[in-house]
């Protein structure tokens, strides 16, 4: 099976999440992007504990497209220090993995 990478981030509005998802797929940096429902995050920021509502975005991509995808997310993300996490799927449907690779070719 070809490898798949999953890139995740969170943003402060559904509309921003939708824009990030659409741009990544349109640019063939991700085969699929899923915008998750609202979650509440609690974190340290500037010496204080903050809580805010955020929307998650999960991108499925080929490993050789990860750096370009991360660069695009960083360039358009509204946060000063955006959460961008990359993980690799260890196993899964080989047909889906092949589809991800096919859809992320420039």
List each model region and its residues.
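Positively charged, small/polar-rich N-terminal and surface patches that mediate targeting and assembly
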Residues: 1-106
